[in-house]
Amino acid sequence: MEALLQLKGIDKAFPGVKALSGAALNVYPGRVIALVGENGAGKSTMMKVLTGIYTRDAGTLLWLGKETTFTGPKSSQEAGIGIIHQELNLIPQLTIAENIFLGREFVNRFGKIDWKTMYAEADKLLAKLNLCFKSDKLVGDLSIGDQQMVEIAKVLSFESKVIIMDEPTDALTDTETESLFRVIRELKSQGRGIVYISHRMKEIFEICDDVTVFRDGQFIAEREVASLTEDSLIEMMVGRKLEDQYPHLDKAPGDIRLKVDNLCGPGVNDVSFTLRKGEILGVSGLMGAGRTELMKVLYGAQPRTSGYVTLDGHEVVTRSPQDGLANGIVYISEDRKRDGLVLGMSVKENMSLTALRYFSRAGGSLKHADEQQAVSDFIRLFNVKTPSMEQAIGLLSGGNQQKVAIARGLMTRPKVLILDEPTRGVDVGAKKEIYQLINQFKADGLSIILVSSEMPEVLGMSDRIIVMHEGHLSGEFTREQATQEVLMAAAVGKLNRVNQE
């Protein structure tokens, strides 16, 4: 079968960093190829070389059998290569049709927009994807899943033969993911080639035909998915065996550090639990169960309407995140790009931002040498891959950004560390490193609350697990009692709480 798109021997270097070295990718008609690798493996750089955002230093790009160089996203798009980014590029205040044909609206012979034709053409594109809504609907009124379908329709409007999807299910529900997979199968049947970039093993084995593996900017292998197992694919990605994905530290917790009694707030109803020194408390539940809301009430980011919180035997009241920090409670947000990091600032500035009081003199000036030493120590401890501490954090991979976010929390010397989805969007290798860090914090006596939608992660890392359902606590289990079936039953409200006090 002749490839629609071939990239061979691609090199790309930046000052101090060799991003790609001999990288390769083949995309075939009617097949879905997964592009996988750890964060920083070169996947994003390869896509930018492909679409003309970056100029390759060496190598060839063959499009429909002819050697080609694209001068930018517009030229690759017009040639028939569409890309759907992780962050959707839509304008909520415009209709679906206006978004699809933005900048290339249909006009009549008088130079005015031909709305009737534009909406009719947009409706045809939606019908191709078997979507039930019309193109006169505002994009802002759609769910994230439906907005993604609009992005696909927009790509199809360019008659795209190859469609690149970057982490397409990151913000989707299970139902929306299944809808997306139906559309991908339809696109396959039309003879289009799909590049599917994802960290989610389950999805790769469900929807992809082939897989290309990158590691450290190099092409490692191209295989048929059917010939692989999850373990063999992960080994190719990280270059080593992952014998123990969840390295649990078997150390008995100490005395009670945090006690929460009858806590209420937005989306949180009458929740009580305890947390011990040197303990990892897992928090499980379905999307919308109130897990993040509970953590924000505890930390002070959302108002507490009633209930009590005691820390080391003393009552604490957190009316703001500053109160949480002052009392030794640190919250690492699930949305690091919106709540956790300032992407335009450097690694150093992000890491020390909430701990500047430790580096300040009486007059308010900073002890820069102390700040730099602390940041340097954390970069080394956390194995943060960055050219320097002055690098803009937005240029780091997701796993390294997450390490910086956690390091920033630890710089404030907390007693309680709340990690909300700490490995979301992080590759398997970086996940293992984060788990090892969490165990290190536990060994040092830090009390950790681990909120996660990944059940194996909660089961593998936690000493004890509580489950949320519709704002209430629906279950509490020891490590020995907890199974995926038990947690799921509690998550859907089918189990009464098991008190382990």
From Swiss-Prot:
It is an enzyme of class 7 (translocase). The keyword ATP-binding applies. Its EC number is 7.5.2.7. It is found in: Cell inner membrane. Pfam families: ABC_tran. ATP binds at residues 37-44. InterPro entries: AAA+_ATPase, ABC_carbohydrate_import_ATPase, ABC_transporter-like_ATP-bd, ABC_transporter-like_CS, P-loop_NTPase. Transmembrane segments: none annotated. Residues 5-241, 252-495 form the ABC transporter domain. Keywords: ATP-binding, Cell inner membrane, Cell membrane, Membrane, Nucleotide-binding, Repeat, Sugar transport, Translocase, Transport. It catalyses: D-ribose(out) + ATP + H2O = D-ribose(in) + ADP + phosphate + H(+). It comes from the Bacteria. Its main location: membrane. The keyword Nucleotide-binding applies. One of its GO terms (cellular component) is plasma membrane. Belongs to the ABC transporter superfamily. Ribose importer (TC 3.A.1.2.1) family. The complex is composed of an ATP-binding protein (RbsA), two transmembrane proteins (RbsC) and a solute-binding protein (RbsB). PANTHER family: CARBOHYDRATE TRANSPORT ATP-BINDING PROTEIN MG119-RELATED (PTHR43790), D-ALLOSE IMPORT ATP-BINDING PROTEIN ALSA-RELATED (PTHR43790:SF3). Part of the ABC transporter complex RbsABC involved in ribose import. Responsible for energy coupling to the transport system. This is Ribose import ATP-binding protein RbsA. The gene is rbsA.
